[in-house]
């Protein structure tokens, strides 16, 4: 019998945080579930942890590297009615997934909850009850790990061409046919602890606003041009208004 929920966990050389992520799952969900760990590390450093926690394991090092490709492999391997994704440095809150699943029995679409953002000095709970399609068309508000959706409702994979925000693009792609439903309460804790960045990662972050433009081009919303311009200004980018009037040609 297939499980109720599939949980896809991409990982890369972070065994301590992967341990924390996998250990959180048992307290987050009591329904039947499977965990799929997709490892980008050539040494397969996540294998022992995946085995210890009873997870399915796939090592994909050297082929289609990156989060998008890992999540897509997880989608292909998943058997659950519902699916969610968890980054290896984040972890689920107790009963968080159970609350989403309980609500999902009566709703069709993307069911999401709130999240906590934390670092070594502080933690803040983020209420997402205000999130709707318009909010999502400006910037992603729902982090990976905070939502579940029906696996059969997935019509497109994560875009491996994007430098960043592939999770935002994935959600926008599916919101039209999978309405958003909010469930109060923290579902996932997002680790914002600063890490040492390589020059490549730093460059990707500096260019992340270009992915905003790519995504906005796919999802034109002229009534939100002002909000989108304001977001770019907050990133230190000022563009002529006409450059935000997109035709979807991607």
Q: Model-predicted segments: where are they?
A:
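Acidic donor-diphosphate engagement hotspot in glycosyltransferases and nucleotidyltransferases
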Residues: 17, 46, 71, 92-99, ...
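Short, acidic, metal-binding catalytic loop of nucleotide-sugar glycosyltransferases
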Residues: 23-32
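A conserved acidic beta->alpha catalytic loop
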Residues: 37-48, 87
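Glycine-rich, basic loop-to-helix element that forms the pyrophosphate-binding segment
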Residues: 61-78
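Conserved donor NDP-sugar-binding/catalytic core segment of glycosyltransferases
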Residues: 97-125
């Amino acid at each position: 019998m297939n499980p109720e929920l599939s949980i896809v966990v991409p990982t890369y050389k972070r065994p301590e945080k992967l341990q924390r992520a996998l250990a959180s799952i048992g307290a987050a969900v009591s329904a039947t579930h499977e965990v799929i760990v997709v490892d980008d590390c050539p040494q397969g450093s996540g294998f022992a942890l995946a085995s210890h926690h009873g997870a399915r394991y796939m090592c994909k090092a050297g082929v289609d590297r990156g989060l998008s490709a890992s999540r897509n492999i997880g989608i292909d391997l998943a058997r659950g009615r519902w699916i969610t994704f968890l980054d290896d440095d984040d972890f689920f809150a107790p009963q968080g997934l159970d609350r989403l699943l309980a609500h999902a029995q009566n709703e069709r679409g993307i069911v999401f909850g709130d999240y906590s953002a934390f670092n070594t000095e502080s933690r803040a709970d983020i209420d997402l009850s205000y999130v709707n399609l318009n909010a999502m068309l400006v910037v992603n508000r729902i982090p990976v790990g905070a939502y579940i959706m029906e696996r059969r409702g997935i019509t497109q994979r994560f875009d491996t061409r994007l430098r960043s925000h592939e999770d935002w693009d994935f959600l926008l792609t599916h919101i039209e046919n999978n309405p958003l439903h909010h469930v109060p309460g923290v579902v996932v804790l997002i680790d914002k602890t600063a890490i040492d960045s390589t020059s490549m990662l730093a460059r990707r972050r500096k260019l992340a606003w270009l992915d905003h433009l790519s995504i906005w081009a796919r999802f034109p919303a002229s009534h939100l041009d002002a909000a989108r311009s304001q977001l770019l200004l907050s990133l230190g980018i000022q563009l002529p208004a006409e450059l935000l009037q997109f035709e979807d040609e991607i």
